[in-house]
Design a protein with these regions (language model features):
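Basic, amphipathic alpha-helical recognition segments used for DNA target recognition
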Residues: 10-11, 160, 166-232, 242-243, ...
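Terminal accessory regions of large proteins
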Residues: 268-269, 275, 281-293, 313, ...
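Glycine- and acidic
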Residues: 113, 146-151, 158-160, 182-197, ...
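A generic short alpha-helical patch detector that favors 3-5-residue windows
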Residues: 180, 225, 293-300, 551
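Short, functionally important structural connectors and interaction interfaces within domains
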Residues: 89, 115, 119, 128, ...
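Polynucleotide-recognition surfaces of large bacterial nucleic-acid defense/processing enzymes
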Residues: 1-147, 151-162, 245-421, 426, ...
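Short, low-complexity Ser/Thr-rich regulatory SLiMs
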Residues: 6, 167, 237-239
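Extended Lys/Arg-rich polyanion-binding regions
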Residues: 116, 121, 166, 192, ...
Length: 626
């Protein structure tokens, strides 16, 4: 930037050249300077009175800003009404913060040990980015007060609705979101509050507008957005109730749209049901609509995905239109029609469109959740995440003539494998029962009847029906990018990719733990963290590892016999299979010794310690978290 100032008091305009966008050294900038001297309409020549700079807090030399922008600062500032009074800092995040899926669900909420905690996150507007918990026990809060590094926000701003954002943005734009009630926040998620809820919603709409983004760039052209950058902004409120009503209505709709998107994924605290199940139900109205649109109504995943895709598009473009309408309103309020346009680029709309591979993988994850009882086809939302398993699920049991459960040694006698689930205080048979022993093997062949592929196929058949099973499995396999038979593709996904995807989605804090013998795939099995018991590893060893070893011995003996009588060509093929089985058997032999050592210890875990601490206790027999 080159500047030519008149003498103080600077009531006349100075001349400014904006050369920062021109690359190529001083010679290029010299040429551009000469060009600007000859042609003031070149696009990078500006005239501005230095008196205007002082109208903006911090007096930035914003010579390119139009006079209407300066006049906007002649109104009240947001800081006149905003409440901001410190943030909470733990001093030891590893000890006091958890992802919301790590700890028992019954310990989460106001008045309990763990509460929701905003700590920034990716660029997102209106709602979301809260997936963290903070320890809010008496002892933890005392630590925050007394520790020389930690601090705690004053009590009067605990659990209030407000506006939060991410302190450090990797995006030129800044996303402002509703901080929901019953949440806390830390310094990575600065937050402000208001006594007037309507004003808060109005300001949330304003902050997500193009005009506000321009102001932020003036006040602080860095990646940080501090509270002072927000409280210093102009506030034009209370002058046009009709206009304010329109803004607030749009903001409330945008919050609802963003919440609907956020809650469609299972890492949300308010997740209810997977979209490909939600959109699979064929009501009479939907059947009529399908036929009207020329589709043959079928209860298949392809149809569910098509409806989900349309719902995502509707939400996406409705939010885009609403944001553009908010931009129009604020551009008109501040008279910047010649400077700003209301259009919003699609890349800046922060709700998600449908994604076939992502959504099919998340369906698989949801199915695994149903296998372990975390979710259920009979009850929406989180069903079991710690606590008394028998209060949520129980096996059908023998009863006497009076209807009382018959027990032996204090243990009720179960009948078959059927489970019942407690739905709002009423016991009913499970449509898709959870795995009884919390152990699901992942095999490269059909060694176990209840291996994960078999259970997944049953899940798909249960949800979508037997008549469409094969085409549904093919749809899933195609979405996973497989080229072989659908069941083989699905098996390969569970064997090679499921756990890694799970770790990514759950931010390296997995709730489904993969017991893994090594690269030869000699043995793999999943358990659900919240159902872990001290004897779980012993049961893995005796009921699954030993069984797998027995099957390897049988398969190896069979192959050796077949090789002895095989032709040359067939012998080569069988020998290759034999080598693979022998390698797997050897790998499993070594693994059995490791798991034997742990099984004998009957190790207990405390879910409040978090995944990182608990996983480390078994790291020698678990898959590496990547």
């Amino acid at each position: 930037m080159y500047v030519c100032f008149p003498e103080p008091p600077c009531t006349e305009k100075g001349c400014y050249l904006r050369l920062v966008d021109f690359r190529g050294g001083m010679e290029v900038q010299r040429q551009k300077t000469l060009e600007a001297i000859k042609n003031h309409n070149c696009g990078f020549y500006y005239e501005q009175s230095a008196d205007n700079f002082s109208k903006i807090p911090g007096s930035p030399v914003a010579y390119w800003v139009e006079i209407q922008m300066y006049r906007a600062f002649e109104t009240e500032k947001i800081g006149k009404y905003a409440i901001s009074d410190g943030q909470t800092k733990t001093g030891n995040n590893d000890k006091y913060l958890r992802m919301l899926w790590e700890v028992p669900a019954f310990e989460i909420g106001r008045g309990k040990r763990w509460v929701l905690h905003a700590k920034g996150g990716a660029f997102r507007r209106w709602y979301g980015n809260i997936d963290t918990l903070i320890d809010w026990s008496d002892s933890a809060r005392e630590h925050y007060r007394s520790d020389h590094v930690a601090r705690i926000a004053p009590e009067y701003i605990w659990f209030r609705r407000g506006i939060c954002w991410t302190l450090i943005s990797s995006n030129k734009l800044h996303g402002f979101r509703l901080l929901q009630e019953n949440s806390t926040f830390n310094l990575a998620a600065p937050s402000i509050f208001f006594d007037d809820d309507r004003m808060m919603l109005y300001i949330l709409g304003y902050l997500n507008s193009k005009f506000s983004q321009e102001i932020i760039a003036l006040l602080n052209p860095t990646l940080n957005t501090n509270i002072s950058d927000i409280t210093s902004q102009p506030l034009n409120y209370g002058k046009s109730p009709e206009c304010e009503d329109a803004i607030i209505e749009l903001v409330e709709t945008n919050i609802s749209l963003s919440k609907s998107d956020w809650d469609s994924f299972e890492t949300s605290w308010d997740f209810q049901i997977h979209p490909l199940l939600r959109y699979a139900a064929l009501t009479p109205q939907r059947i009529a609509q399908e036929e009207k649109n020329g589709y043959l109504p079928m209860n298949g995943i392809a149809d569910a995905y098509r409806h989900w895709e349309q719902a995502c598009d509707d939400r996406f473009y409705q939010l885009k239109a609403n944001e553009e309408e908010l931009n129009r309103i604020f551009i008109d309020i501040y008279g910047l029609q010649d400077e700003l346009t209301p259009e919003v680029e699609e890349k800046d709309v922060t709700v998600r469109k449908a994604d076939l591979t992502r959504d099919v993988k998340s369906l698989i994850s949801y199915a695994v959740g149903c296998m372990f009882g975390r979710y259920s086809l009979d009850h929406q939302g989180l069903v079991y995440a710690g606590g008394d398993w028998e209060q949520t699920y129980h096996r059908n049991v023998l009863v006497d003539e009076g209807g009382n459960a018959i027990s032996f040694g204090g243990i009720r006698i179960a009948v078959g494998k059927n489970y019942q689930i407690n739905v709002d205080g009423q016991w009913q048979d499970c449509t898709y029962p959870p795995e009884a022993d919390n152990i699901i093997p992942i095999c490269d062949d059909e060694y176990f009847e209840d291996d994960i592929v078999g259970r997944f196929v049953t899940f798909i058949e249960t949800v979508y029906g037997k008549n469409t099973l094969e085409e549904n499995l093919k749809f899933i396999a195609d979405a996973l990018g497989g080229k072989s038979q659908p069941r083989d593709v699905i098996r390969s996904y569970f064997l090679n990719d499921f756990f890694n995807d799970h770790c990514k989605i759950y931010q390296k804090r997995p709730i489904y733990w993969q017991f893994d013998s090594g690269k030869k795939n000699g043995f793999k099995a999943l358990i659900y963290l919240h159902r872990y018991q001290p004897d779980t590893i012993a049961r893995i060893r005796t009921d699954y590892v030993h069984e797998q070893q027995s099957r390897y011995r049988t398969a190896i003996a069979d192959l050796e016999q077949r090789i002895a009588g095989a032709s040359t060509a067939e012998r080569v093929k069988l020998t290759k299979q034999l080598k693979k089985l022998q390698d797997q058997a050897e790998e499993l032999h070594v693994y059995e010794e490791k798991i034997h050592h742990l099984a004998d210890q009957m190790i207990a875990i405390d879910l409040d310690d978090g995944v990182k601490v608990n996983y480390a206790k078994f790291q020698d027999v678990l898959a590496k978290i990547k």
